Amino acid sequence: KGIRSVQKHKKRLKQGDFFPPFLYISIINSCNLRCQGCWVDVAAKQEKIDVEKMNDIIGQAKEMGNSFFGLLGGEPFLHKEILQILEGNLDVYFQIFTNGHFITPEVAKELKRLGNATPLISVEGTEIVSNERRGKLQVLNDTMEGLHNCLDAGLLTGVCTSVCQTNYEDLVNDAWIDRLIELGVMYGWFHIYRPVGPDACPELALTPEQQYNVRKFVVETRAKKPIVMIDAYHDGDGNALCPAATGFTHHISPWGDIEPCPIIQLSKESIYDERPLKEVFNESEFLSDFRKIAAESTRGC
């Protein structure tokens, strides 16, 4: 289905129409953690997209041939209706970006019953580093408990890391990947740390050499380890890639703003505008100009 969504997207482009084949939706801004470099103002007044509006967004996207959605936060499992959103849309698939703290055995079993979501659980380093990176205590223990609940329930589960100076040595190595494989994790995703948000911490950003090494490690791991490694920053030929510049993805914030991606929090349109999403994506000069300028000036994130 995902491949068909991309094929329909490419066909639309040839006809002068635009609608991204993949939508990432931050359904709530609240979170129990306070991570360094988080692009969401999690301490702000809670904002969320309700079930009715989510069903509307997903329904409009399905009409365009979309079948895959990313759910983000804040912490998505703080949205009390997240399971209702999943159950109301069993004909599409969701990837849920989560810290895992609210995935109890019961929640994991319900996700398994629904069968249309994969949890992508974030691990940010050792116990000490996790506490520092995420602004709370016992973070790693709670995350690993959620991870084990997912695996015990038989869920297709991934682990992601925002790779930065304090976890680069601990997690970008064979030992960590081997541990994930031993646990039963099916896929990994290394994000490159971007210093943004209320607590940007630019000192945590990787050097160009370290970024290159992360890419090299991902490629080499794909060839020798029984685990899928995702890389959102390069295409199949190894060229730097910005998914928003290609138009493959765009993002909807908890406030309903339609943005290039979660990190670029600039918008002129909203899901609450009295226009169908098809019209918004086709007529947005801001998004069109962003894609054009980003593609011309740099392919990378």
Go through the PLM ranges and name each one.
Residues 31, 35-38, 242, 256, ...:
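Short cysteine clusters
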